[in-house]
């Protein structure tokens, strides 16, 4: 029963954290590439379902059956993190800041664009100073596409 209480408290704390982040987060108006908000709410639903299953199974002492619930919580957290953190923001003429799922940022210049690699579930943009991973669910702005084309011509 103690495990169920701890799991419920941790689940509720994470739920409050993610909900506050999405409410405080400004709209994606300044982003040239972003993950749509519906993915956050899908992740939230999966997280809540997983937390319910996990806490219920821990409460009745079925530790083995709590594992699928905990895995659902992990997938829900990953979806919410992607929606909140993974984006590309324009900071000037042809300069962009890419933020990963975990919030790590890197600057890229459109003139440093080398090539694009299409994967089954994403795009990888190669630049002279690194690479940028863009998920297939991401919304890509026309300005970003055009600046990459212009950068490739130079």
Report each predicted region and the residues it spans.
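Small-residue hotspots
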Residues: 43-54, 66-79
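Generic beta-strand structural signal
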Residues: 91-93, 118, 127
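N-terminal membrane-targeting/pre-transmembrane regions
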Residues: 1-57
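Conserved beta-hairpin
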Residues: 71-107
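Phosphoinositide-dependent membrane-docking surfaces
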Residues: 96, 105-121
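Canonical phosphoinositide-binding patch of PH/PH-like domains
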Residues: 124-149
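Hydrophobic alpha-helical transmembrane segments
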Residues: 1-7, 60-73
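Membrane-helix interface/capping segments
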Residues: 25-28, 58, 89-96
